Structure formats: structure tokens, C-alpha cells
């Protein structure tokens, strides 16, 4: 299971976060982690990350929305608690697990995933 502690980033900043976008691809949600970035575009989920902070090489994974089996979002109710997103991709047994810092609004991401899976 890949677990990433993330902060939300403005979608407009995504172009400077990664050079892996194709012409005409629009970023709807972007999250940054200490070791990488995860982008939710109109076409796919793009994950670019290093194994650890000192690693120079970056591994990039691209998942079309059709490979998303299902997702779950758990929002923190208590002040200062984290929200989590789990996304089951392709034939991977364990989900991609994003832990968002307190105050992160995950409703736009939930709406995007629901629209893409409908």
C-alpha cells in the first residue's frame, strides 16, 4: 500500500509541479507530498514520486480512470484530524492511500472521482 501525507495545491500550479501532462490535459485537483505529487486530471490520475526524500530518480505512474475499481473518503470530524482518501487501482490488492492534512476540502475530489466513474 502506498501511503502519502499530502497538502492540497492549487490546480493552476500543477504545470510547474510536473512536466508529464499532455497537450490539452486539464488538472482538476493537485496534491503535493514530501516525496512527490499526485494530479487528478480530466483524463487520468498521475502519481510522480521518489522512494525517499534523498532519491534523485522519480517514478511516474499513470492510471486512466477506467482502472479505478472504487474509492472511499473519510473526512475528519474532530478539529485537527486528517481526512483520508483510498483509491483501488487496477489489479493492485492495496489502495493508494492519501492522508490529507487538517482543513483540506476533499469534496471537489470526491465529486471528480464520482463523475469519472459514473
Regions found by a protein language model. Give the residues of each.
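Anionic N-terminal interaction surfaces
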Residues: 1-38, 90, 101-103, 118
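Charged, low-complexity, helix/coiled-coil-prone segments
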Residues: 4-17, 47-62, 115
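Hydrophobic transmembrane alpha-helix bundles
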Residues: 16, 29, 66-73, 97-98, ...
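Phosphoinositide-binding peripheral membrane targeting modules
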Residues: 21-37, 41-93
